[in-house]
Amino acid sequence: MKIKNVRVYGQDLGTSRPYTIAYKTVSEVINAFVEIELENGIIGIGASNSSKAVVGESVDETLNHLRDVDFSYLIGQKITQTEGLLRQTHDKFTTLPGTHAAIDIALHDAFTQFLNIPLVDYFGQQQRTLPTSITIGIKNIEETLSEADEYYGMGFRFLKVKTGLNPALDAERVIKISERMPEVVLRVDANQGYSTGDLNEFVKRTEKIKLELIEQPFSIGNFIKYVNELHPSIAQLVVADESLRNPKDALQLLKDASGCNIFNIKLMKTGGLLVAKQIAYIAECSKVKLMWGCNDESVVSIAAALHLALSSRSTKFLDLDGSLDLIKDVVTGGFLIKNGMMTLTGKNGLGVQKVS
């Protein structure tokens, strides 16, 4: 069965909840989409929304790149050659992770639909379900508590709070949530906004509450140096996010920042599933815990991440809430969320259905 056609388009999916993190405010959500059609009518879909600040490619640039791609390297090729096609895609777009991700995910979806199996079965499912956290942006205390109440009412028991501007105010927000709902598990994400002094102050102020993890407190350039300056009890909470984009980064972190033993994999950083799977294998061999995160993304790429996350025994944390505040999407399905627990649907490929 051969690839017949490739289509590219962009879509503003909107957001019902604009938010602020340490280095930007988000008020619109544009995703790039790739559809790969086979001769028998099967259509695999991929999506991406990479961050210019993190990987050097914006979604607008992704769309421009995709529209310029000569897809003759795919069209006419057998879908059973997907592994080779994935490597060709990687070689062509190594420095363009958004472009790479959209094509990579579409190939995986088309291939596993052709095989009549869910994508997770192709990888080998290791876990059935895990809780995802849901994120609260940088807000004042009243707004923070209001949003926490809303998510609690929806059944979520893992909350991630964006921080990174002021450790004292950040700590106060987190403490207030813990006091109001002590059974909730709290995570924080400083998005590179702290110095070591800031982080130590934040940890000291929050020492009486239970924090599960702290994502990327330091800038990419200082991450390894600053992690090595932390007390081991603090370093073990730190998650490498923006500092982890590819297997080379993973190996460097293992070598030079051994106190950091949680990696956050995002398909928008790795360029899709092929490279993400390599990082997951490195983590599994090294006893590193995995967290799977996202940007503001279509169900398409969120589902792709969940399929791979549930195929790794090292996966301990999910933060795959990137589609929950979208005003619309181009697909439905992909996964189920009940009381904050994420489960796959058991349908072939990504398990998504195009909205007509």
Task: Name the predicted role of every residue range.
Residues 293-334, 339, 347-349:
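Active-site pocket-lining/capping segments in soluble small-molecule metabolic enzymes
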Residues 161, 168-301, 328-330, 337:
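Catalytic core of soluble alpha/beta enzymes
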Residues 76, 117, 236, 288, ...:
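Short glycine/serine/threonine/alanine-rich loop segments
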Residues 1-186, 191-200, 205-207, 322, ...:
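N-terminal capping/lid subdomain adjacent to the active-site entrance of alpha/beta enzymes
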Residues 111-112, 231, 283, 309:
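A generic structural signal for well-ordered alpha-helical segments
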